[in-house]
C-alpha cells in the first residue's frame, strides 16, 4: 500500500501534460494546413476510453475550443449529447428512422458536420459513420488491432472525400508498450 501511495503522490505532482499539449499544437497546425487546402476545419480524434475522452474535451475547451467539440461514444448520455439529439429530432422529422441508437448517431454526425470543429470519439465511432467532410484523423491512443486503425481512418477516407486524409498518430517514445504497438502497426499496415 505504501508503494501505491508513492505512485499516487508522484502522479499528483505532474503539472504538465505534454501529450495533450502536443495534441493542441497538432490541431492548430493541421487546421492551418486545412485552411490552405480549402478543406473544412474538422478533426476526428480517437481515444480508447471515455475518461480520456472527457479529459480531452475539458482540456481542449480550456484552450480555445469551447463550444466546438462533440463527443461520440457508446453511451451518448451526457447532457450535451442528449440536447443535440433532441434538437436534431425536432428539426429533422423526415430523417428519423425510429431506431433511437441510429438516430442518435445521425444527430451527432450532423452536429459535427454543421456546428463542431472536433469530434472526440471512442471505438463506438470506428464503424458505420460517414465523415467524408472531415480530413483529419488523430489516433490519440493506438489500439493493438491494425484493423481498428484502418476502420478509424476509413470513417473519413471514403467515397466523396475531396481532400487527402491526414492521419496523426500519438506515440510516447519513452513508453516501451506504445513504441511496440506502433512498430507492430507500422509493419502490418504501414501507418
List the model feature ranges, each with a label.
Residues 1-116:
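Conserved Helicase C-terminal RecA-like lobe
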Residues 50-51, 118-124, 144:
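Conserved helicase core region in the C-terminal RecA-like lobe
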Residues 55-56, 130, 148:
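Phosphate- and divalent-cation-binding pockets in alpha/beta enzyme and binding domains
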Residues 109, 120-134, 154:
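SF2 helicase motor core recognition
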Residues 130-141, 166-168:
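A short beta-strand element within the Helicase C-terminal
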Residues 156-184:
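Conserved segment of the helicase C-terminal RecA-like domain
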Residues 189-191:
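Conserved small/polar residues in nucleotide/adenosyl-binding loops
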Amino acid at each position: 500500500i505504501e508503494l501505491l501511495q508513492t505512485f499516487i503522490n508522484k502522479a499528483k505532482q505532474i503539472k504538465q501534460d505534454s501529450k495533450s499539449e502536443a495534441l493542441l499544437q497538432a490541431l492548430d497546425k493541421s487546421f492551418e494546413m486545412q485552411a490552405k487546402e480549402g478543406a473544412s476545419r474538422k478533426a476526428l480524434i480517437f481515444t480508447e476510453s471515455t475518461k480520456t475522452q472527457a479529459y480531452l474535451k475539458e482540456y481542449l475547451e480550456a484552450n480555445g475550443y469551447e463550444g466546438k467539440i462533440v463527443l461520440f461514444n457508446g453511451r451518448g448520455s451526457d447532457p450535451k449529447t442528449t440536447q443535440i439529439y433532441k434538437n436534431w429530432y425536432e428539426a429533422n422529422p423526415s430523417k428519423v428512422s425510429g431506431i433511437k441508437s441510429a438516430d442518435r448517431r445521425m444527430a451527432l454526425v450532423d452536429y459535427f458536420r454543421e456546428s463542431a470543429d472536433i469530434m472526440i470519439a471512442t471505438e463506438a465511432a470506428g464503424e458505420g459513420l460517414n465523415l467524408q467532410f472531415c480530413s483529419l484523423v488523430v489516433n490519440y491512443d493506438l489500439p493493438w488491432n491494425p484493423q481498428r486503425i484502418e476502420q478509424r481512418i476509413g470513417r473519413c477516407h471514403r467515397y466523396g472525400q475531396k481532400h487527402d486524409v491526414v492521419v496523426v498518430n500519438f506515440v510516447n517514445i519513452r513508453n516501451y508498450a506504445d513504441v511496440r504497438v506502433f512498430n507492430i502497426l507500422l509493419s502490418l499496415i504501414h501507418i
